């Protein structure tokens, strides 16, 4: 797709300009070129989100909004998990402060004094946490850049975000304890140090929501890894192993700058290089290509005698293309090179044109048909199996192949693995002969296919890291709540031991409540995770089945880590000496 830069005068109505561009129009004289084109104007600040740039070399960077939405969603879930954890632990800490606030009110402290104390404590706590967070960011910056194969730089937004957290978070966390203790009588504040049933339920609800979010992140992370594994290990429908893509023409391709003499000279060099590579004794097959197999080809509208039209990827290839990539014919026979025009379609293109059988299949370029209604249609001589040129989730592209010996600036070479050193030496000799250098610009097809999923690897890695952080944060919250909860029940545990309760009975008593919270959280998170995964993959042509496995693994993983966090506290409580506890109470 052609891209040009324009600068408009202030006040130009760009919406009106884009409405004009939607109307198809001729670019060339319609007597010999009946193709019609549309255009649109994209603001420079928005061009990053337009994915068409992925199919061509460009000076602009590009990205996907879907990836931004995913990362934003994961960050939001992790933030909510941490926020709930903070609220839960802070409320537990406030239970111990009730007596202190009550006594201060008795000795004359007013509401302003209480608010300043609470706000100062939260401000210092937030500042300390923010300092630790920035320290972690600095320490992990290099490994994170390597892990995600990118470079993160600081922006003014980071500073404003830190200032916002430093100012707003202490205010948010100070509101509840301030109203609770400033508007209650000193006697109520002193008595609130207890651990009532209402407090237990509210904290368990917070913990349950926190674990539901953790399960949600963990399940999504497991599915993303499952989907990535499927894409990396699914056969794309063509051979990728031991195939090299070599660029061998370095002359300018700007025909406006070439004289006729220079053009003929460059063509002669190109033919000579292609012939040299074609006769290489270390190559199984060679195929000169203009469009790489991992990228979309030139799109052309074709029509059938019945008037069915479809936009197809048009590739000019030789018969060796199908041999090199091991693309089999479902119907028909692969033609040989001759002076006739032969067309081959893949199964997806046949469906797009509503063609069922090879016998009735014939097409013509819509451009030629509009120019001459009596033009002859070309028969489809074979149907090739579908293959995935790009991202697996997008499915197979509707492709039509015109069989032609077409020279280009690069060549695919299929070789035997043990012959690679000899092949490279041969190519170096060719480059030395024509360009005076042994530098060979080449890539392996396997690496290019894997590179298609680089962004998916990053997303899966981020999900894994965030899921781990969510589990750790939830376990810290569980640790804080259980530490206070179990300590408050020491007297109950001592009495039960005196009355004959065994270790098994005590373990069941103390584990039961937390297992119930985990179970309810899992039940709540499961349908939500299923819905989010189903919605995200709704347009995927190839997608991993959701399956029960990811839910079971998430449950077992989170439960083992969480129960391990509880175990040492419960074991310590179960082994207490009843006499010691009764004396201290």
Residue ranges of each PLM-predicted region?
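Short beta-strand boundary microenvironments
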Residues: 1, 256, 261, 269-360, ...
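"Rare, low-scoring activations can occur
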Residues: 1-61, 268, 274-281, 347-351, ...
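Membrane-proximal extracellular/periplasmic loop immediately following the first transmembrane helix
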Residues: 3-9, 18-23, 36, 40-50, ...
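Membrane-helix entry/capping segments
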Residues: 25-75, 96, 140-161, 195-205, ...
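Small-residue-rich transmembrane alpha-helices
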Residues: 40, 88, 122-186, 226, ...
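Hydrophobic alpha-helical transmembrane segments of multi-pass inner-membrane transport and secretion
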Residues: 62-99, 127, 202-227, 457-491, ...
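Intracellular coupling helices
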Residues: 84-125, 183-193, 476-516, 575-584
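Alpha-helical transmembrane segments
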Residues: 140-148, 213-242, 536-541
């Amino acid at each position: 797709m052609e891209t040009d830069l324009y600068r408009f005068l202030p006040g130009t109505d760009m919406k009106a300009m884009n409405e004009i561009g939607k109307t198809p129009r001729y670019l060339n004289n319609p007597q010999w070129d009946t193709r019609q084109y549309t255009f649109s104007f994209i603001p420079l600040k928005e061009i990053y989100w337009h994915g068409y740039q992925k199919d061509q070399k460009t000076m602009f960077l590009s990205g996907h909004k879907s990836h931004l939405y995913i990362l934003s969603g994961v960050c939001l879930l992790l933030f909510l998990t941490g926020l709930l954890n903070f609220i839960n632990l802070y409320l537990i800490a406030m239970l111990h402060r009730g007596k202190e606030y009550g006594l201060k009110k008795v000795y004359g402290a007013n509401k302003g004094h209480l608010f300043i104390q609470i706000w100062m404590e939260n401000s210092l706590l937030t500042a300390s946490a923010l300092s630790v967070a920035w320290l972690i960011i600095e320490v992990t910056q290099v490994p994170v850049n390597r892990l995600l194969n990118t470079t993160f730089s600081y922006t003014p937004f980071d500073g404003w975000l830190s200032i916002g957290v430093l100012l707003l978070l202490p205010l948010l966390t100070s509101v509840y304890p301030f109203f609770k203790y400033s508007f209650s009588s000193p006697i109520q504040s002193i008595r609130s140090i207890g651990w009532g049933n209402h407090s237990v339920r509210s904290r368990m609800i917070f913990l349950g929501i926190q674990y539901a979010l953790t399960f949600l992140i963990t399940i999504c992370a497991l599915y993303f890894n499952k989907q990535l594994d499927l894409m990396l290990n699914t056969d794309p429908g063509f051979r990728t192993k031991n195939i090299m893509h070599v660029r061998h023409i370095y002359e300018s391709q700007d025909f406006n700058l070439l004289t006729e003499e220079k053009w003929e000279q460059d063509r002669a060099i190109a033919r000579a290089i292609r012939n040299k590579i074609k006769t290489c004794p270390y190559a199984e097959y060679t195929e000169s290509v203009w469009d790489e197999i991992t990228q979309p080809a030139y799109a052309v509208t074709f029509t059938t005698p019945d008037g069915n039209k479809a936009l197809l990827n048009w590739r000019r290839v030789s018969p060796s293309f199908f041999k090199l990539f091991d693309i089999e014919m479902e119907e028909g026979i692969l033609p040989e090179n001759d002076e006739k025009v032969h067309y081959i379609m893949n199964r997806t293109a046949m469906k797009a044109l509503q063609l069922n059988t090879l016998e009735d299949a014939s097409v013509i370029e819509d451009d030629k048909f509009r120019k001459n209604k009596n033009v002859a249609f070309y028969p489809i001589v074979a149907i090739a199996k579908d293959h995935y040129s790009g991202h697996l989730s997008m499915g197979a592209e509707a492709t039509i192949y015109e069989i032609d010996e077409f020279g280009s600036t690069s060549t695919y070479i299929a070789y035997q693995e043990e012959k690679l050193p000899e092949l490279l030496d041969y190519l170096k000799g060719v480059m030395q002969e024509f360009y005076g250098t042994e530098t060979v610009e080449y890539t392996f097809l396997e690496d290019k296919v894997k590179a298609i999923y680089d962004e998916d690897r990053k997303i899966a890695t981020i999900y894994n890291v965030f899921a781990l952080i969510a589990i750790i944060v939830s376990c810290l919250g569980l640790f804080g709540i259980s530490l206070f909860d179990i300590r408050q029940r020491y007297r109950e545990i001592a009495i039960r031991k005196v009355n004959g309760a065994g270790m098994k009975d005590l373990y069941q008593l103390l584990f039961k409540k937390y297992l119930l919270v985990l179970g309810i959280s899992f039940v709540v998170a499961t349908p939500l995770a299923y819905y989010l995964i189903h919605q995200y993959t709704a347009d995927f042509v190839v997608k991993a089945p959701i399956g029960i496995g990811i839910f079971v693994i998430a449950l077992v993983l989170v439960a083992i880590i969480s129960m391990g966090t509880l175990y040492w506290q419960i074991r310590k409580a179960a082994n207490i000496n009843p006499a010691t506890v009764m004396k201290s109470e």
